[in-house]
Amino acid sequence: METGERKRAESSEDAVVYGPGSYVIGEDILPGEYAVFTEDTSEQNAYSTCTITLYKDDTDARRIGTFQFQHHGLISLYKGQHLVITKGYAVEADRAGITPGTTGMYKAGRDMEPGTYRITPLTSGSGYYALYNDVRYYYDYIDEYAALFEPVTVNIANGQYLELFDAGSIERVPD
């Protein structure tokens, strides 16, 4: 098994960046929550994606899933799992310096303030939003999901995760 490329991030707090490659959690990369970014994060580039595959262990016999994120996503990694980064790079989420935008995934209380937000679509039916209570396997932990046909108002609790795809804007509104 070939281990991926590790390098120091030029961004926040000397975070380690894990490039495309193969990583056994607990051996090659520490367990925890990670942000996975596309190579092109300029201007919230909607056509740039990152792709990872996560396996239950390093035998690759039990695939948890293949995930593709627009701009960036968040995922929890546990000891013994096997992560394959095909496209993009990963960095510890607490050191990733994520700021709210119109695409990607955000944790309330760390990347954005908890509260009520209005999400407006880029164009009718072009995007979606989802709320998760955990980012270990995504769909098992989804609280809410909707396509964006018109502006919607969502309440985001501390610790919840908001995923946006092709939103035109997001703004905080009074609770």
Which sequence ranges carry the predicted segments?
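Primarily secretory-pathway and cell-envelope proteins
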Residues: 1-16, 40-100, 123-175
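A glycine-anchored, Pro-Gly-centered beta-turn/N-cap motif
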Residues: 19-21, 25-33, 104, 108, ...
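Secreted/periplasmic proteins that engage bacterial cell-wall peptidoglycan
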Residues: 27, 32, 38-39, 43-46
